[in-house]
Amino acid sequence: MKKLLALVLALVMSMSLVTISNAAYSDKADIDLKEAVDVLSAVGVFEGSDGKFDPKANLTREQAAKLVAYLQLGQKSADALVGGNKFTDVAANRWSAGYVDYCATTGVVAGIGNGQFNPTGSLTALQFGKMLLVCLGYDADSEGLTGADWQINTSKLMTSAKLLKGLDSVKATEVITREQAAQMMLNALKAPTVEYDTKGSTITINGAVIGIGGSKATYVTATVAEDSTVKNIGKTQLTNSNEYTVELGEKLFSNLKLNSTADAFMRPATKWTLKAETIGTYADTPDLTYTAGTKIGTIYSDLGLSDGISKKNVTEYVDGVYAGAFAYDIVKGSKDKVGGNGVLLNVYYDDDAETITFVEVNTYIGKVTAAYPDTTT
């Protein structure tokens, strides 16, 4: 019975979101990171091959160069690029020559040494992250994304930009698949862009590239009144300012919009549109999931919180209905409980807004209130 109820609940939840995908790949059933693949396909960055996306295949270095060129220039301009002058193992007639040379010229890639690029080699999350950071505006030399300490410096900026969000099981040093690359690119679209007043110069000491004389990277900003596209994907307001960060997706795709919504159970969801056409609506992944009554203190610990959250910043829904003002602050060691047996509890934590949403779904058919002895008639 429990298995049956779980299957029914899963079916109902999946039907609560209607997704119109632009990525009509024949192997779409194999795609786990559907939101990322759909959005990046809709804007023309991914196109697949022979009608397939091949989500589990490792991303190669030359494929990554093509993705970045498509992202920054658009397909038509990127396909018009010519190359073959930067690396000895990327001939002018190789399909990826234009993309590779473009990325090398703009500082997105630097090769593997000895004048080579290794175009068919695989790519780690850290290496692809460095490419995306340059797309966001970070200067590779100024930020130390080259040289002996490039991995440490790249990892720090990737964490700040949340480039691995949704890829909790992926280590930065691991080779990434095509769908994982799509997820990283989706995260980049939602990350703020940066700029420099001056970039300065660099010196190399014991293999470490050190930037000198340059200014620090600052967020590219705009006011809502000056740039309405700032509301399309992100709207992070700077402290004590009327300025808002401009995310990469807003910079590159003015018709791409991201709106927060919810499904029938009031689970937070994301709706993407392009030129007013819906790409899809996707339920957010909960930060925590429980199937029994859970102490507030446990949730506090499992979220890794260091400060409490006021009950005023907590919202609770039960079977899609607002449950009223939440009764408890989210504090360390609290023994107050939320959820219960037979209740699926999803916890959504917004670390930027410092809010928590509890979504509870009753998975039982009925509740036994009394038991009677068996009788015969």
Where are these regions (language model features)?
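Extracellular interaction modules
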Residues: 95-96, 174-178, 339-340, 352
